[in-house]
């Protein structure tokens, strides 16, 4: 029995382990696996997108040949089509702007803060994605995405976050 429990724990922890053979320069090997978003440009990859509360929320990655050339930006578009938020602005290396975690149960999330407001883009392995907006310990908003996602658990996303040195939340 102990062996089975240990094996299950080992397999679960491997679910979000970064592929060792990838480099930031070739991190998109399966571009069709990523969602698409009108908020991300033609030279960018949509790492994550969500439609909720008549808005579109996307995490766009701009790849470079080297890790220091890559950047990630969170964007929000309102119902009129206007981009109302870009973070970080200007776009820069993600290690100073975001944190990333892929847990043993397969859930993954990207966290960041703008001032005293915290944002969590959450991709549960077995449920629909959502955005949690907090201030201190109080949740200000919980936006459930209209579509499923699970793109934060893709091997390419995991490899990119690790290659770029995006830290785990503290």
Language model feature labels by segment:
Residues 8-16:
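Bacterial N-terminal signal peptides
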Residues 1-8:
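Bacterial N-terminal signal peptides that target proteins for export
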Residues 99-132:
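Short, structured surface segments that line ligand/substrate-binding pockets
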Residues 136-170:
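C-terminal partner/receptor-binding element of secreted or periplasmic proteins
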Residues 69-78, 110, 128-135:
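Short polybasic amphipathic segments
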Residues 56-58, 78-87, 117-122, 128, ...:
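Short, surface-exposed beta-strand/loop "edge" segments at domain boundaries and coil↔beta transitions
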Residues 19-23:
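Sec/Tat signal peptide C-region and signal peptidase I cleavage site
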Residues 24-93:
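N-terminal secretory signal peptides
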């Amino acid at each position: 029995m102990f062996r089975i429990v240990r094996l299950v724990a080992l397999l679960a922890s491997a679910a979000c382990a970064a592929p060792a053979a990838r480099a930031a320069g070739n991190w998109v090997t399966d571009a069709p696996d990523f969602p698409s978003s009108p908020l991300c440009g033609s030279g960018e990859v949509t790492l994550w997108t969500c439609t909720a509360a008549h808005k579109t929320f996307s995490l766009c990655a701009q790849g470079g040949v080297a890790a220091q050339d890559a950047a990630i930006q969170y964007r929000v578009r309102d119902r009129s089509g206007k981009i109302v938020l870009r973070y970080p602005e200007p776009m820069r290396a993600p290690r100073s702007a975001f944190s990333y975690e892929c847990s043993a149960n397969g859930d993954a999330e990207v966290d960041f803060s703008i001032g005293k407001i915290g944002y969590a883009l959450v991709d549960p392995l077995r449920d629909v994605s959502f955005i949690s907006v907090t201030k201190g310990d109080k949740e200000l908003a919980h936006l459930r995405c209209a579509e499923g996602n699970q793109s934060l658990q893709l091997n390419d996303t995991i490899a990119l976050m690790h290659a770029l040195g995006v830290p785990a939340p503290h």
